[in-house]
């Protein structure tokens, strides 16, 4: 199973991943010492799971995930490679607002018998904004937050959810090579997201 956590800044995507990482033994794939690059992914083994978990991206910084990966194609390549090794957990701010590229990946993996879950975290906008403000204060940023970008992205994410479930022809024009389908899109409770997402893997 591939689980793509989606949410705007401050929604808790990275917090969910770190919560799941805390449930087992984590090994970085592609070393991080010296001048070596950041990890390509992490291997997570959890007692009781039938498959290992692969977590895409780097979690060396406070805000982890895939946003430091250079292209969406590279993210998709890693997802596809690691999906053949076990479960995959992936998140990032940029990918949270994209549909067509990941609908194509969804359908490609589905044809191989690998489920793809679009997991949208239901964090209220004001909570997201407050968390972003807190991060800025922790960094020493004193200028007021321009809320427009986070607000716009919060609404964009909801539009992507609609595209997943409403099967509109206009939304699928750029999903090249695949027929319109209802995708497995789910809302995740921001208050219990770690246990809810982990439960899908158990």
Q: Over which residues does each language-model region extend?
A:
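Conserved phosphate-donor/acceptor-positioning beta-strand/loop module used by diverse small-molecule
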Residues: 91-92, 112-134
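Hydrophobic anchor at the beta1->P-loop junction of P-loop NTPases
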Residues: 5
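Walker A (P-loop) ATP-phosphate-binding motif of ABC ATPase nucleotide-binding domains
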Residues: 2
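Conserved glycine(s) of the Walker
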Residues: 10-12
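A conserved segment at the C-terminal end of the G1
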Residues: 14-27
């Amino acid at each position: 199973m591939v689980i793509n956590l989606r949410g705007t800044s401050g929604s808790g995507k990275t917090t969910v991943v770190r919560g799941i990482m805390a449930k087992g033994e984590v090994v970085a794939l592609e070393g991080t010492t010296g001048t070596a690059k950041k990890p390509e992914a992490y291997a997570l083994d959890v007692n009781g799971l039938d498959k290992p978990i692969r977590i895409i991206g780097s979690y060396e910084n406070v805000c982890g995930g895939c946003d430091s990966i250079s292209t969406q194609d590279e993210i998709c390549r890693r997802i596809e490679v690691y999906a053949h090794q076990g479960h995959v957990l992936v998140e990032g701010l940029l990918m949270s607002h994209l549909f067509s590229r990941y609908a194509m990946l969804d359908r490609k993996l589905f044809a191989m018998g690998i489920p793809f879950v679009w997991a949208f975290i239901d964090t209220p906008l004001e909570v997201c904004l407050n968390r972003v403000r807190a991060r800025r204060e922790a960094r020493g940023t004193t200028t007021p937050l321009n809320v427009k970008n986070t607000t716009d992205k919060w609404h964009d994410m909801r539009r992507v959810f609609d595209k997943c479930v409403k099967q509109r022809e206009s939304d699928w024009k750029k999903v090249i090579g695949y027929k319109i389908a209802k995708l497995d899109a789910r809302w995740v409770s921001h208050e219990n997201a770690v246990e809810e997402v982990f439960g899908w893997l158990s």
